[in-house]
Amino acid sequence: PLGPSFQFGRGESVFVRYRVLGFTRSREARVHLECTLDAMDPRGIRLVETQRKTVDTELSPEDKDWAPVLLHEFVIPPLADPGRYRIAITAEDKLSGQRAQAEVFFQVRGPVVEPSDTLVARNFRFLKGEDGPVVAGPPVFQRGEMLWARFEITGYKIGENNRIEVEYGLSVLGPTGKEIYAEPVAAAERSTPFYPHHYLPGILSLNLEKAQPGEYTLVVKIRDLVGNQQYESRHRFQVR
């Protein structure tokens, strides 16, 4: 068992093992159990489909102290929210009709992305590289460098079967305010995941090899095709 302070990371596997006791044996020494496991996030939304295990066997006389041990495994979604998660286990004795239930909790660590009722980009930051570090202070880049930016998209609508259709692009305004570059669809997410994550990570890059010194504006445009929403944000940076 894990200690009370243990926290799982997103994308990690969780293994659950338990023993079932007090079940009925038929005259033929038969045992028949149906067990289920559900894993739910802090909002009560299931992470994966209900897992089912069946124990249907006949015991021999030397099995008088035998009890079934069941093992489940599931993966925490890579975009799961941090917080307290719940595992609910049910065991049903098909011979007697009795049911037993148990629950256990575990913690998941990860970044917090504030939810929104409408489409928005959160936590925009300029980076010095694809994986950081974050630009501290005014965003100033040298000509020839690669500009990177990251943000989280939330507030999009989720369609039937958890359908998500979000795309985003960029444009760059030069020192005079005129658009000098555009990439309408830099990336897109079109999926129907079982677990409806409430945000998506966004990343953009821009080659400054031909940029002249001056102040520029990076315009981020996001479109939610399921909810028919659009969002735009502007972020200034300098090239020296």
Language-model segments: which ranges?
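Intrinsically disordered, low-complexity terminal regions enriched in Ser/Thr/Pro/Gly
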Residues: 1-240
